[in-house]
Regions:
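N-terminal small-domain helix-loop-helix segment of the aminotransferase-like
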Residues: 2-105, 112, 160, 278, ...
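Helix C-cap/helix->beta junction micro-motif
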Residues: 34, 141, 199-200, 319, ...
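Conserved glycine-rich beta-strand-loop-beta hairpin in the small C-terminal domain of fold type I
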Residues: 288, 303-313, 323-336, 367
Length: 400
C-alpha cells in the first residue's frame, strides 16, 4: 500500500481518537495475560452473570415465521410499537404508536437525534459526571458537548442547570436515573428543566434505560417523560437494560411536545430512520414475548443490585471508603480517601488484590476522589471483592 493511502490525512478528524491505553488498562491486560485472577467490579453484561433467563421462551420468540418477511417500516413495525405503548400504559402514560420510533439501540437513538437537531459544531448540554460514550457520539456526529453539573450534597446528587448554561444549546440530555450516580430526576428538577427549555428553546433528550431499576420508593421522583407536551422531548429506552437483553439491539424513541414542533420532528426523524432501516425484523416480531419474559429477568437483576448495594453499604460502614446514596441503576459510587487520586486507588486495588474498579475520571467527575463499581456481579464474588477492597483502603490509610 502506498504512503498516500496510509497517511493520517486519509482519515477524518472526527475519528482521530487517542487510542493509547492508560496505566490502569495496561496493568489489567498484563494481569490477564499472565493468568492472574481479576475480580471485575465493572462488569455490566447480565447475560454473563448467572441470571436465569427463560431460554425456551426466548428461543421460541425468535423462531416466529413472520420474522422471515421483510417489511421496511421507518418507524418500526406497528405491532412492536403497540407493545411499547402498552409498557407506558402500565405506567399510566398515554403514548400513541405514531410517536414511537424503533432503533438499533440507545446509541443509535442519540445519533439520530443529534443529526435531527444539530448542525455541525452546534452544542448539546450533557451532565457531568456522565457516561464516556457521550464524547464519542458527539464527535462522530460533529456535535460539541457542553456540560451542566450534578453536585453531591449530603450523599445525594442534584442537577444544577441554569438558563445561562443552556443558552444556545440545541438539546439538554437528562439521564434518569443518572449513570453512574443512580440519581433519579425529581419533580422540582423536571419543572426547572422544562422552564429552561421553554425559555431558551433546547429540546430535551431523556435517557430512561435504568428507569425500572429503583432501589427504593421516593415520591419526589418525576417518573417517565414519555408523552410530555410542555417542551419538545425525546424519551429513550430499550431492551438492553429493560429486559436484560443487550444482544437483541432494540431501542426506541418516544417523541412528544407542542404539536407543531413534535409533528415536524417526527416527519424529519422518519426520513432519517428510512435512510438506515437498521432494526432487524426478527427482534421486532419477537418483541411481545421478549417484553413479557423481560419482566422476570428484570426482577432478578433488580434483586441482585439491591443485595449487592446493601453488601457494599454495610462493608463501608466505619470505613475510610464510603458509599454514596444510590437511588437506582446498576452502579454505585464510592468516595475514596484523598491520600491518593482515583486512578492511584484503582491501580493499587488491581495490583494488590486483582480488583478492577473504574476511577471516577472515566466518568468525568470534577474531583478525583471517586471510584465506580457495578452492582451486577455474582453476590458471593462481589461480597468477597468488596471486603478485600475495604481492607486494602484501611491498611493503606494506616500506613500513610
Amino acid at each position: 500500500m502506498s504512503v498516500a493511502f496510509t497517511s493520517l490525512g486519509m482519515f477524518s478528524r472526527r475519528t482521530n481518537w487517542d487510542r493509547q491505553p492508560n496505566r490502569l488498562t495496561e496493568l489489567l491486560e498484563a494481569r490477564r495475560a499472565a493468568g492472574q485472577p481479576v475480580f471485575d467490579l465493572t462488569i455490566s453484561n447480565p447475560t454473563e452473570l448467572g441470571i436465569d433467563y427463560p431460554e425456551r421462551e426466548l428461543l421460541a420468540a425468535l423462531s416466529n415465521p413472520q420474522a422471515l418477511r421483510y417489511r421496511p417500516e421507518p418507524r418500526g413495525l406497528l405491532s412492536a410499537r403497540e407493545v411499547i405503548c402498552r409498557y407506558y400504559r402500565e405506567k399510566e402514560l398515554c403514548v400513541d404508536p405514531s410517536n414511537v420510533f424503533l432503533t438499533a439501540g440507545t446509541s443509535e437513538s442519540y445519533s439520530l437525534i443529534f443529526k435531527l437537531l444539530c448542525n455541525a459544531g452546534e452544542g448539546v448540554l450533557v451532565p457531568r459526571p456522565s457516561y464516556p460514550l457521550f464524547d464519542y457520539l458527539a464527535q462522530v456526529n460533529d456535535v460539541k458537548l457542553r456540560h451542566y453539573h450534578l453536585r453531591c450534597y449530603d450523599s445525594e446528587w442534584r442537577l444544577d442547570i441554569d438558563r445561562e448554561s443552556a443558552e444556545g444549546a440545541k438539546a439538554v440530555v437528562i439521564v434518569n436515573p443518572h449513570n453512574p450516580t443512580g440519581a433519579f430526576l425529581k419533580r422540582p428538577e423536571h419543572q426547572e428543566i422544562v422552564g429552561v427549555a421553554k425559555e431558551n428553546g433546547p429540546a430535551l433528550i431523556v435517557d430512561e434505560v435504568f428507569l425500572d431499576y429503583p432501589l427504593a420508593q421516593d415520591d419526589r421522583r418525576f417518573g417517565s417523560t414519555a408523552g410530555d407536551a410542555e417542551a419538545l422531548t425525546f424519551t429513550l429506552n430499550g431492551l438492553s437494560k429493560l429486559a436484560g437483553l443487550p444482544q437483541m439491539k432494540l431501542g426506541w424513541i418516544v417523541v412528544s411536545g407542542p404539536p407543531p414542533l413534535a409533528a415536524e420532528a417526527m416527519a424529519r426523524l422518519e426520513i432519517l430512520c428510512d435512510t438506515y432501516l437498521s432494526v432487524n425484523s426478527p427482534v421486532q416480531v419477537a418483541l411481545p414475548p421478549l417484553m413479557k419474559t423481560g419482566g422476570r429477568v428484570r426482577s432478578q437483576i433488580l434483586q441482585r443490585v439491591k443485595s449487592n448495594y446493601e453488601t457494599l453499604r454495610k462493608a463501608t460502614l466505619n470505613s475510610p471508603c464510603s458509599v454514596l446514596n444510590v437511588e437506582g441503576g446498576w452502579y454505585a459510587v464510592l468516595r475514596a480517601p484523598q491520600t491518593k487520586s482515583d486512578e492511584e486507588w484503582a491501580i493499587r486495588l488491581l495490583e494488590k488484590a486483582g480488583i478492577y474498579v473504574y476511577p471516577g475520571y472515566f466518568f468525568d467527575f470534577d474531583e478525583h476522589k471517586y471510584l465506580v463499581v457495578s452492582l451486577l456481579p455474582n453476590e458471593q464474588a462481589f461480597a468477597s471483592s468488596v471486603q478485600s477492597l475495604v481492607a486494602i483502603v484501611e491498611q493503606n490509610c494506616q500506613t500513610e
